[in-house]
Every structure is written in structure tokens, then in C-alpha cells.
Amino acid sequence: MSDAAAPEEQDELSGGSVQELLPGLQRDLEAEVIRGFIANIAIYPVLLLYFFGTFAYVTRNVVPYEFIDEQFHIGQTITYLKGHWFTWDPKITTPPGLYILGWLNYKVLKPLLKSWSTLTILRLVNAFGGLVYFPLVVLRPIFLFNAISFWPVALMSFPLMATYYYLYYTDVWSTIFIIQSLSIGLTMPFGLSKSIWLSALFAGISCLFRQTNIVWCGFIMLIVVERQAIIAKQFNTHGLNNYLKLFIHSVEEFQTLVLPYALNFVGFFLYLIWNRSITLGDKSNHNAGIHLVQVFYCFAFLTVFSVPLWFSKNFLRMYLERTNRKQVQVFFEIFLIMMVIRYFTKVHPFLLADNRHYTFYLFKRLINHNRRIIKYGLMAPIYHFCTFVYLEILRPSELLFDPISPLPIKDPNLLPVQLTHISWTALILCTFATVVPSPLFEPRYYILPYFFWRLFITCSAEPIWGEIVPGKSNEEPVTISSTSRLFLEFVWFILIDIVTLIIFVRYSFPWASEAFMQRIIW
């Protein structure tokens, strides 16, 4: 669904089953949706057995003790369980959302699971959230809205988040609450006003788990206002004019569309005044700065995780053709990336001192290699390609408009889950705003940039390696489908999950300062 305004695609926007792409070439959208539903229904129970079985094994046999940051998170939750609500560990840098949720979870489950340890019960918070609540409550409504673009069973298996289903970290519920906000903002299940207030509430709650979620709260607000303004103000191809229409509509409908989210910004501003910093606790090791190369780290991770979505002969050919066609421009783009590597790479002491994370090995052996041919000559072109992937995979999913005629859709709730040129720009800016200030090279920080990017991607139906050959005029049209790519995305995530789990289970080493064996995670 790339060009919603094109006349030949009005059938698709209004719910048509077969989409004619070219003479002799079509997509059967209804068949793709049915296959997607069947696959998700069949895979989900097996996935639950795998993840909960793995959870039991890891918790009992691999790390039946507090692991890395868990010592702070578990300790603070136990402090709350003891009733010491105003005692705070100064080494903790995130708000108390996880500890309040953990306290509630413990109070509910401990009477039912008396023989279970406190550690296991608290870890169940993330296991339940990621494996049950996230796919069924958060992702399912968007899937029903846009079933040919992603599978919930794949996104719940996303490796950067699935790792923390076994541990007591803030990332799972931070993601759940902010994506819940987006889900409600897109689908409006309770009517316009109630849905927006509920969406804003979930966005605000998510900030109790990670402060930078306030940025994504702003993005969700823009999405909500934009989807209403597209219809009310009849967006067209005049880009700057659409910005003005969006602004006018946000002012006219401030109380309904903007105020609920604006209250979150007011609360966050008061928090900054009170705390004098975005970081709680250990501010000395988490000073914000300009770490521009983080953007390329993020794009590189997203490119690797999205291989099944973009990889094809045609996509690679498109990159090479652009490189050949714009050689001078590409040269300066790569030169600019080299300058970013040279002057905007921050080496945090934690990164070089902690060999329990993949980033330690990636940074030491590849990203910051002492040979310049690798650090600059290899990594700069890689970052250039990854940036191309990030931008180009979104381009076919952009919602386009006609210069004169308005969209055939009259109800904002029926708009496809696509970005316009405005929200497309906002997504990039929000990604910059969340990753650039961080001094730490932490893949966990790329979870939300990934989900906000992935949920707006319309999966390609192009064959991965073959060529599309439309049927002849006297033959049945050739039907292409995105089902195989969506299935491969799920398989790709599961393979990464299994490999990282094997490394986590099989490879251990001692630390002089720790009583238990240490292991490697993201």
C-alpha cells in the first residue's frame, strides 16, 4: 500500500482483495491476511512453550542469582516490598516504574507461588509482559489493522527485547507501554477523546520506566494529530503547506488532540526542574552529549535485524546504481561519515571495562579497530549502506497525496498505517534525539527506534533472489506475496535468539568482583 492517493489503488484502500500492480502482476491481499492469521495462531502456542521453558531453565540452572543490573533493580524492588518507599539507590538512573510494577506483581503472585523465589517471581514480570501482554494486547490491534505488514509472533521474538524476558530489566515494559500508546493512537478503540487520553496515559506511564520515552510521546502525538489533519485539512503534494495545515489543526483541536500529551510534557519539565538532569542517581557516568556515531550503530543493528525485509537482487542493484550515478555525492556522504567517526565517537569507560556485552567485542575488534582501513575504510561504507537501507525501506511505505484530489478515505480511522513526509521526518528526528545524547553504546537503546520504524514498514512482496516476470496478456496474472518474507523475518529472529541463548548458557567466566560466573548478553 505505497501510494494511497493513486486512483488505481483506491480499491485497495477501500478494502479490495486483489491488487493489480502491473499488467500481468498482482497481489492477493486477502490470501496474505489469511495466511498471516493462520501462521500466527499456529506458531504462538509453540513460541510460548519455547520461551517459558527457556525461562524456567535459565532461572533455575543458568542464572539463579542477580545478574549484572538486576542487583540494583531487585534491590530497589525489595526496598519497596519492605515499605521503604522513600529510600532510593543512587546508582539507579531510571525512574521507579519497574519497581512499582514488580511490587504489585509480587503481592499478587507470591501468595499463589509460595515456593518460588523472589527473583523468579520478579522476573516473571517481563516474561508475562513480553510473551502474553505485548503480542495479544499491544500488537494484535495493529496487526488486525495492517495484517500484511508484520506478524506479532515475529516482533515479540525481536532479539534485543527477547533477551530480557528472562531477566528483571526496565526495557520490556518501557517498550510495552509506549507501543501500547501508539497502538491506541492508531486504532482509536474507545472513540476519539477516550482513546487519546488513554494513549497519553500509557505514554506517560512509559516515562516512569525510561525518561527518553518522552520523545516518543511527542512522536505519537504528532501521528494522532496528523491522521486527523490529513482528512480534515485535505493534505496534498504541497509539502510545506501540509506542515502549516498540521499546525493549524493542532491549534484548532488543541484540547482534544494535543492537551492529553501536553500534560506529559509539563510533568517531564517539572521533573527536570526538580532533578536538574534527565538522569536519576548516577549522573557522573551518564552525562548527555553529542554522540553522533550512535545513529550509525543504530542503523547498522536495524539493517541486520531487517535483512529478510530488504534483501533482494533488485535492492542491492538499486544501491549500486545510486552509487555509480552519484559518485561525487556518495564520496562526500562517506567522507562525512568518516568525520563523524573521527570527531563524534565517545568511548565510555563502561564499554571498555565490561566484557559481558556483545558491544565490548564489536567495539574492540571491529568498530574501533586500531587499523584505519577497518575503522574508516570498512565501517564508513557499511554505515552508508545501512543508512540507505533505513531510509529506502520506508520510502515505498510513505503515504502519498494527489496535487488536487483529496484522499478517497473520509474517516481517519480507515487510513493505512503509513507515515507521511511529516511523520517520516519526525521519526528520524526522534531516533536522533533518543540515541545521540547517550554516551553508552547500548543496543537496548535501539529497541524503540526499531519498533517505531518497523511498525510503519509495508513489507515488500518482491522475491528475495528471483526476478518478477509478469504474466503475458493471454495468461493468468502472476501473484506475488509478502508471506515468505514475513515468515523469514520470524525465523531470522528465532535463529538469533537461539544463538545468543546458546552463548549465554554455554560460555561463562569469572569476575573477581562478582561471586557468581558471568555471561554475555546484548
Curated annotation (Swiss-Prot):
Membrane topology: Multi-pass membrane protein
Keywords assigned by UniProt, alphabetized: Endoplasmic reticulum, Glycoprotein, Glycosyltransferase, Membrane, Transferase, Transmembrane, Transmembrane helix
Catalytic reaction annotation: an alpha-D-Glc-(1->3)-alpha-D-Glc-(1->3)-alpha-D-Man-(1->2)-alpha-D-Man-(1->2)-alpha-D-Man-(1->3)-[alpha-D-Man-(1->2)-alpha-D-Man-(1->3)-[alpha-D-Man-(1->2)-alpha-D-Man-(1->6)]-alpha-D-Man-(1->6)]-beta-D-Man-(1->4)-beta-D-GlcNAc-(1->4)-alpha-D-GlcNAc-diphospho-di-trans,poly-cis-dolichol + a di-trans,poly-cis-dolichyl beta-D-glucosyl phosphate = a alpha-D-Glc-(1->2)-alpha-D-Glc-(1->3)-alpha-D-Glc-(1->3)-alpha-D-Man-(1->2)-alpha-D-Man-(1->2)-alpha-D-Man-(1->3)-[alpha-D-Man-(1->2)-alpha-D-Man-(1->3)-[alpha-D-Man-(1->2)-alpha-D-Man-(1->6)]-alpha-D-Man-(1->6)]-beta-D-Man-(1->4)-beta-D-GlcNAc-(1->4)-alpha-D-GlcNAc-diphospho-di-trans,poly-cis-dolichol + a di-trans,poly-cis-dolichyl phosphate + H(+)
Subcellular location: Endoplasmic reticulum membrane
GO CC annotation terms, alphabetical: endoplasmic reticulum membrane
Chief localisation class: endoplasmic reticulum
Entry coiled-coil feature ranges: none
Protein name: Dol-P-Glc:Glc(2)Man(9)GlcNAc(2)-PP-Dol alpha-1,2-glucosyltransferase
Originating organism: Candida glabrata (strain ATCC 2001 / BCRC 20586 / JCM 3761 / NBRC 0622 / NRRL Y-65 / CBS 138)
